[in-house]
Curated annotation (Swiss-Prot):
PROSITE patterns (UniProt xref): RRM
InterPro entries cross-referenced by the UniProt entry: eIF3_g (IPR017334), eIF3g_N (IPR024675), eIF3G_RRM (IPR034240), Nucleotide-bd_a/b_plait_sf (IPR012677), RBD_domain_sf (IPR035979), RRM_dom (IPR000504)
Span list, region Disordered: 1-59, 209-234
Organism classification: Eukaryota, Metazoa, Chordata, Craniata, Vertebrata
Post-translational modification: Phosphorylated. Phosphorylation is enhanced upon serum stimulation.
Annotated function: RNA-binding component of the eukaryotic translation initiation factor 3 (eIF-3) complex, which is required for several steps in the initiation of protein synthesis. The eIF-3 complex associates with the 40S ribosome and facilitates the recruitment of eIF-1, eIF-1A, eIF-2:GTP:methionyl-tRNAi and eIF-5 to form the 43S pre-initiation complex (43S PIC). The eIF-3 complex stimulates mRNA recruitment to the 43S PIC and scanning of the mRNA for AUG recognition. (Microbial infection) In case of FCV infection, plays a role in the ribosomal termination-reinitiation event leading to the translation of VP2.
Modified sites of kind Phosphothreonine: 38, 41
Keywords noted in UniProt: Cytoplasm, Initiation factor, Nucleus, Phosphoprotein, Protein biosynthesis, RNA-binding
HAMAP family: eIF3g
Subcellular location: Cytoplasm; Nucleus; Cytoplasm, Perinuclear region
Gene source species: Homo sapiens (Human)
SUPFAM superfamilies found in the cross-reference section: RNA-binding domain, RBD
Entry-linked Pfam families: eIF3g, RRM_1
Name assigned to this protein: Eukaryotic translation initiation factor 3 subunit G
Gene: EIF3G
Biased composition (Basic and acidic residues): 221-234
Length: 320
């Protein structure tokens, strides 16, 4: 196999290794052996040593923008930077468009259009949701019913009025006999009712002890005269008003809130359907005083309630 010395042209990779491991720049020496697109092997005139740096160039072709810049690194080597951008058209509100046309000031007075990473931080869009007052009330923490009972006395001692049982009172042996003796001296009742002259002795205690049946005529209170409710009923009839033209969704609580400002109410009767439970359209309101009922008629009659005009008048007295 013949051997001999021959001159070989160094490859492009060897030249890159000899020049150094700096991959940021492309010098004119490296471009000598690289064929250009036009077939010319001469380097770009902008990268020749001693030539001034040309200004940046922008070329827009449709929606593609190409920006070409020339810079010099720390070693004095020239290099070219080519950046390609895709232009997108986005719709924005008029207020946002006007803010983009504002002139920059301060440290960003000479910055190009767009945000500067040194002074501006671009983050994700945050959407703000406003809640109503009802939702705000629902978000409030519900009060614990046990916290209300903390300040109340559940157990009260009959001797010292402390918050413990009477059987566990530490002053039971000292204050108990003293209170009993004082009550006897003052003639206070100790729980047993004194018998009045001519009054029959109640048989209720005997019934509890023996368990025998006691007829109603011999029970406690049998000698007292019964009270008639007829006068009270007549008073209710005199202070009762009749409300008509009510909606089907009306409830007794609605009538209570509507007529409560005029005076004290004794009873409310709302006529309802037996099957559906809805209002039949009329109701009766009884006040304790006739003056309050008169003011309710003057104030509510002709009043618009639940998209209906109410009619209020005096109720006819019952014939029973």
């Amino acid at each position: 196999m013949p051997t001999g010395d021959f001159d070989s042209k160094p490859s492009w990779a060897d030249q890159v290794e000899e020049e150094g491991e700096d991959d940021k720049c492309v010098t004119s020496e490296l471009l000598k052996g690289i064929p250009l697109a036009t077939g010319d092997t001469s380097p770009e005139p902008e990268l020749l040593p001693g030539a001034p740096l040309p200004p940046p160039k922008e070329v827009i072709n449709g929606n593609i923008k190409t920006v070409t810049e020339y810079k010099i690194d720390e070693d004095g080597k020239k290099f070219k930077i080519v950046r390609t951008f895709r232009i997108e058209t986005r719709k924005a509100s008029k207020a946002v468009a006007r803010r983009k046309n504002w002139k920059k000031f301060g440290n960003s007075e000479f910055d190009p259009p767009g945000p500067n990473v040194a002074t501006t931080t671009v983050s994700d869009d945050v959407s703000m949701t406003f809640i109503t007052s009802k939702e705000d009330l629902n978000c409030q923490e519900e009060e614990d019913p046990m916290n209300k009972l903390k300040g109340q006395k559940i157990v009260s001692c009959r001797i010292c009025k402390g918050d413990h049982w009477t059987t566990r009172c530490p002053y039971k042996d000292t204050l108990g006999p003293m209170q009993k003796e004082l009550a006897e001296q003052l003639g206070l009742s100790t729980g047993e009712k004194e018998k009045l002259p001519g009054e029959l002795e109640p048989v209720q205690a005997t019934q509890n002890k023996t368990g025998k049946y006691v007829p109603p005529s011999l029970r406690d209170g049998a000698s007292r005269r019964g009270e008639s409710m007829q006068p009270n009923r007549r008073a209710d009839d005199n202070a009762t008003i009749r409300v008509t033209n009510l909606s089907e969704d009306t409830r007794e609580t609605d009538l209570q809130e509507l007529f409560r400002p005029f005076g004290s109410i004794s009873r409310i009767y709302l006529a309802k359907d037996k099957t559906t439970g809805q209002s039949k359209g009329f109701a009766f309101i009884s006040f304790h005083r006739r003056e309050d009922a008169a003011r309710a008629i003057a104030g509510v009659s002709g009043f618009g309630y639940d998209h209906l005009i109410l009619n209020v008048e005096w109720a006819k007295p019952s014939t029973n």
